[in-house]
Amino acid sequence: CKLMLKNYKVQAYFINEVGSPEFNHQFNYAKKIELNLEKIDFDNLKSIEFSGVIIDCIFGIGLNREIKGKYLKLINLVNSLKKKIISIDTPSGISADTYLSSSHIISDKVLTFHVPKLTFFFSEYIDKIKNVEILDIGLDNSEYKRMEGVGELIDINIIAKKYKPRKKTIHKGDCGHALLFAGSEGKYGASILCGKSLFRSGAGLLTFLCDEKMKEFIYKSLPEAMTYDIITKDNFSISSKIKKYRVIGIGPGLGMSKRVIENFKMILNESNYPVVVDADGLNILSKDKNLFEKLPKESILTPHIGEFKRFAGNFENSNEKIILQRRISKKY
């Protein structure tokens, strides 16, 4: 209606003349201002072909079933026209929070309201939903913040809340001491990348738990880092010191040798602080799920899909993946 009032040539198509109270109100308003309205003839959809831009409002965010029959025919036709398509709230055929395997509108732009929808981040859709613009429609933020979601979108606002300004008199001893257990022969680069990231994120001190060969790479790439020999049965001296490390990173390029597994278990037994587990650290957990019970509180796991399936089990779609992830998080 607003486009017509701005002198755009608009043709609106509707499926039913009666719907929800909101639909009825808008439909009556459209008739009142004499918007060009036409009921869709599913047996003759050719009139849509002459559109320059298509605004998609066939279905809303409440959709919870597969698209079939005449609606599927309509969606496939719209996609085949290769016109510029703008979807409102979500492309028709895509639910706000549930994966549906049927066809959906492939939009050039999505104008969604208040917040991005969960499905926008599903692997099945993320490459197909393009150019999302979030519009403020005046919803009550206080009510919205009390609602429980399935996750939290990490953006600059979240990061800004975690930022702690540093005093001018601060020194490295005030900024935490991290332990990194990563890298093995042929994969030392993984540990170096992790070490650089730790320093970049603000760690004051960093110690690598590593073998003799790896030390040379560390001293050349990160001379400010310290090293400690990987533990053997003859040398468990570091186990008593594990408690001093404020965070421990485990896994990238680590391998799964017997000695690595022994050190991994020792860290979980001794640490009082969170651990970040990635790569081979996750593979070790997958081999011995009893180790999940020993993960310190607020530990973080960072699996890719293959690693996740090894310890969580298989899933068919993103909905099942989220259910598995939440179940494991609550359990451990």
Regions inferred by a protein language model and the residue ranges of each:
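Internal gly/pro-rich beta-alpha loop/helix module
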Residues: G52-V53, I58-G149
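Glycine-rich, charge-decorated loop segments at or immediately adjacent to ligand/cofactor-binding or catalytic sites
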Residues: N24, P91-I105, L282-L295
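Small-residue (G/A/S/T)-rich helix-start motifs and N-terminal tracts that mark the onset
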Residues: C1-E17, E49, K109, F120-V275, ...
